[in-house]
């Protein structure tokens, strides 16, 4: 068996096509969605990631609002940039690119953001709304995983899902999304400290690997026909970026998301969705 590909690039392109029409409809009502970014310092990876987000914006007609600060920026200067975007009506959603320089209180920065403009869906208030099953911007990567599964008809309802990872961006919110009544999955959350991880994985219909541990998920751990989504990012001894899923898993799984090209494009697409939905809420 060779797994079918869960193609994040193609799915993201379809989402962008839909968003282009929604943005055009908003502009007819006098509203242009705007994505703001706050980038502190000159980390090449962060610069590349932010530039990609603004290229995505241009493709669908979303305005770009960029705030760049030097690596020497103080807590107060970064907080001032956050307040500026909170008050800017042209900005319907924004992100603070992480990580921030050492000595900066990241949680304080994130808490200052207007929850309604939280394009990443990771504001403490919005994560709380997710726990309470209240409407809120959803975390981009977990929502991207769900959207990808749905597009390819992978059965979520009643599925046994193992989420490997406990980070705030994926591991923590992913089970919250999967256990909503609209999804009705049964979730086991594992991590790098889980005893006998393999025994949990072998029962899973769906595996979401987000531990950041190279090739943690091995072919012998996977039930034949399972859907496996590789969200992890780490580096090999040679410095090459690798995922959490061993390449051999593709010969056992029924569905697999490539890394790169799987969940990554979906994360960026869901960011745009959050920005457009915020603009749509503003016009009722």
Swiss-Prot record:
It comes from the Bacteria. NADP(+) binds at residues 165-167, 192, 233. HAMAP family: THF_DHG_CYH (MF_01576). Keywords: Amino-acid biosynthesis, Histidine biosynthesis, Hydrolase, Methionine biosynthesis, Multifunctional enzyme, NADP, One-carbon metabolism, Oxidoreductase, Purine biosynthesis. One of its GO terms (cellular component) is cytosol. Catalyzes the oxidation of 5,10-methylenetetrahydrofolate to 5,10-methenyltetrahydrofolate and then the hydrolysis of 5,10-methenyltetrahydrofolate to 10-formyltetrahydrofolate. Its EC number is 1.5.1.5, 3.5.4.9. Signal peptide: none annotated. Pathway: One-carbon metabolism; tetrahydrofolate interconversion. GO terms for biological process: L-histidine biosynthetic process; methionine biosynthetic process; purine nucleotide biosynthetic process; tetrahydrofolate interconversion. Homodimer. Belongs to the tetrahydrofolate dehydrogenase/cyclohydrolase family. One of its GO terms (molecular function) is methylenetetrahydrofolate dehydrogenase (NADP+) activity. It catalyses: (6R)-5,10-methylene-5,6,7,8-tetrahydrofolate + NADP(+) = (6R)-5,10-methenyltetrahydrofolate + NADPH; (6R)-5,10-methenyltetrahydrofolate + H2O = (6R)-10-formyltetrahydrofolate + H(+). Pfam families: THF_DHG_CYH (PF00763), THF_DHG_CYH_C (PF02882). This is Bifunctional protein FolD 2. The keyword Ribosomal protein does not apply.
């Amino acid at each position: 068996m060779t797994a079918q590909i869960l193609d994040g690039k193609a799915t993201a392109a379809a989402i962008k096509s839909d968003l282009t029409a929604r943005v055009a409809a908003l502009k007819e009502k006098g509203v242009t969605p705007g994505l703001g970014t706050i980038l502190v310092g000159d980390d090449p990876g962060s610069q590349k990631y932010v530039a990609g987000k603004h290229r995505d914006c241009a493709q669908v007609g979303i305005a770009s609002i960029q705030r760049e600060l030097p690596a020497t920026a103080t807590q107060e200067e970064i907080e001032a940039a956050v307040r500026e975007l909170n008050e800017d009506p042209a900005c319907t959603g924004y992100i603070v690119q992480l990580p921030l320089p050492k000595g900066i209180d990241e949680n304080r920065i994130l808490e200052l953001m207007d929850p309604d403009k939280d394009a990443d869906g990771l504001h403490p208030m919005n994560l709380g709304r997710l726990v309470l099953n209240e409407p809120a911007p959803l975390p981009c990567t977990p929502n991207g995983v769900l959207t990808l599964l749905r597009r390819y008809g992978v059965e979520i309802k009643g599925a046994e899902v193992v989420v490997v990872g406990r980070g705030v961006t994926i591991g923590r919110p992913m089970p919250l999304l999967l256990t909503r009544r609209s999804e009705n999955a049964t979730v086991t959350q594992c991590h790098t400290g889980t005893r006998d991880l393999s025994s949990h994985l072998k029962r899973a219909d769906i595996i979401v690997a987000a531990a950041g541990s190279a090739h943690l998920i091995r072919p012998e751990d996977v039930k034949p026909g399972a859907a496996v989504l590789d969200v992890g990012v780490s580096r090999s001894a040679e410095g090459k970026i690798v995922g959490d899923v061993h390449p051999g898993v593709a010969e056992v799984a029924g569905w697999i998301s490539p890394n790169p090209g799987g969940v990554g494009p979906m994360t960026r697409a869901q960011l745009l969705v959050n920005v457009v939905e915020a603009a749509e809420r503003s016009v009722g």
